[in-house]
């Protein structure tokens, strides 16, 4: 993890350039099964981290907000705390925390190291077992304190669920400002909770449908800079842009990276008005055609292992979801419900496909298994589109515009469909794309 490393409070091991230590004497008495349809949030006490200034309390607040937004945890109001933590290295008075039904306690401190580095220590305690579950410390640049908070939240999430978290990640999206008649659309990037917003393009050209590379440093997106939609690549840190396939005679759109990051899959418009799916090797710039039908084939998305591609096609008369091999062979229709389907995207876990559906005059965000079975609608509205998966495949982000609203906003929802959350953005927002974990 660039600019970060974590060290032990007990046993030292070197893994992937990170020095990691943790004490795990026992499993938490309450474990969260994220595969269950409805989960009762776990009451957890997140104390203010001790610090000379206010940074410790700010880190605690971000941790609490992350965990609460997941729908799996219920941070207890600090006003209910009986014990005031004065030394996070010493075990809490567990009986005091049992009184307020805190299943777990998070304590910590934040200090400034020589050279200006920030040091954050935290411990997670099992209240009813009376034991420490994990203890870690992190060093970072002072400006990266929010990332430290997200990583701690990920650690707590994993301790309870047995799965990686998703808080240390970013969202690239289309920022929309101005009136409907003079709407300015620019690419922007932010943390998954809406913090650290930064514009990536200047808004002089309409942009659509960004998507992250697996390495997280590059984005593919669609721009109308030349008067018609074309696929571009953008380096996030440098701002360098590149037109993909500048010899394409017609429009290109709906682009995504393959799981390795060395190819882009996209749709190219034919002169007869139909579109087919192509791949481009980013090293050789050679293209390969995957579909060849008199239909509109679009919105391709790779399976996590790179062996399959899901896409939409109206070859059967109306837009439906199909799955084919990565070389274009053996296309099979998997959606058979009422309405039309679009924007399928494979879960990073490989078990589900998210999609947008239009049925009964409304838009819907839904999921189905990779063979088309088990279709389930998570959210319905006047206009909701653009599903994108969290890195752990447990949450979906999308954009919603209600009837009469001046513009769209971003929302997230878990796979139960019961935890829909507004994602704060400075302006209207659409077309979100979730990054892999940064850590």
Swiss-Prot record:
Keywords: Cell cycle, Cell division, Periplasm, Signal
GO CC annotations, alphabetized: periplasmic space
Entry keyword Lipid metabolism: no
Subcellular location: Periplasm
InterPro entries in alphabetical order: 6-blade_b-propeller_TolB-like, PD40, Tol-Pal_TolB, TolB_N
Subunit note: The Tol-Pal system is composed of five core proteins: the inner membrane proteins TolA, TolQ and TolR, the periplasmic protein TolB and the outer membrane protein Pal. They form a network linking the inner and outer membranes and the peptidoglycan layer.
Protein name, per record: Tol-Pal system protein TolB
Organism for this UniProt entry: Chelativorans sp. (strain BNC1)
Top-level taxonomy: Bacteria, Pseudomonadati, Pseudomonadota, Alphaproteobacteria, Hyphomicrobiales
